[in-house]
Amino acid sequence: MRPEDLARLSVAELRTRLLDRGEALGDACEAALEADPRAGAREVLRLVRKRRRENRAEGQRLRHLLRYEAELWERGLVHVAGVDEAGMAPLAGPVVAGACVLPRDYRPRGIDDSKQLDRAERERLAEDIKRNAVCWAVARAEVEEIDRLNVYWAGMLALRRAVDGLSARPEHLLVDARKLPDLPFPQTPIVHGDALSLTIAAASILAKTARDALMAELDLAHPGYGFARHKGYPTAEHFDALGRLGACPIHRRSFAPVRVALGLEPAQGDLFALAEAAVAEDD
C-alpha cells in the first residue's frame, strides 16, 4: 500500500484492510495516516499500533513460556512432551490427564494455565492444540482407582496413561511439579509448570476440557447434583445435593465429605498433605 492510496480509502476500507486483514503498514504510510485530517483514519492507526504492541508483548510472553522447551530443542531433541492432570480436588468423577508433543514453531495466542482461562478460551485453544500438535492424548483414572490407590497415586496413573497414549515416543517429558515413576526417558518436574511451560499449559487445557465435557455427560446420567456446573468440586450446591440425595456411583467414597454423607468415617485424611509429602520425596 502506498501513502497516496490512503486518502482514497474510506475509514471503513482502512479498518478492513489494516485491522481485519492485517495488511502491512510501512513507515511512510504510518506518517500519512498520522497526518490524515480524518479522526477515524487516525483512530485506525492508533489501533494498528496498539495491536502491534500487544503482539510484541504476546511474543515475548510465549518465548518465556518456551524456555524449558527451547533448552531441550537446542540439545537436538524433537519430541518434547508435556503432561498435566485435572480433577484432583473434586468429590466426584475421575482424574483426567492430558499429554501432548507440540511442533517447535507452534505459538498459540493466549495460551496459559487452564485455570486462568474462561471456558470459551479453553475450548478454542483445545481444538487448536489438537489440530496442530505432533500428537496428543487424554486418559483418566476412574473413581474406583481413586478410592483404592488414593487420589495422588490415581493422578499419577492418569498421567502415565496419557503419556503412554502418545503416538510419538517422547524424548523428554515436562511434568507439573512431580516425577512419574519408571519412565524409560528423562523428565523434568516444574513447580507451577502449567504457568511456566507452554507444553504443560497445553496439556492442562486438554485435560480440563476433556474432564469438563465428561462431567457434563455424567450430569445427564446422575441428575440433581449439578455436575455440569460445578464439575464435582466441593461447592455449596454440591454439598446441598449430597445432603438431599446421598452419594451416587461417581462419588469418591474415600473423600471425607462423601463418607460423611454415607454415614462413614473419613478414610483418606488430608490427601493434599500426602501429595505434597510424595512430591518432596521425589525431589
Curated annotation (Swiss-Prot):
**Molecular function GO labels:** manganese ion binding; RNA binding; RNA-DNA hybrid ribonuclease activity
Protein location: Cytoplasm
Query: Major place of localization?
Result: cytoplasm
Query: Under which EC number(s) is this enzyme classified?
Result: 3.1.26.4
Give me the segments passing through the membrane.
none
Stored Pfam families = RNase_HII (PF01351)
Q: Which family does it belong to?
A: Belongs to the RNase HII family.
- Report what the protein is called: Ribonuclease HII
Source species of the chain: Anaeromyxobacter dehalogenans (strain 2CP-C)
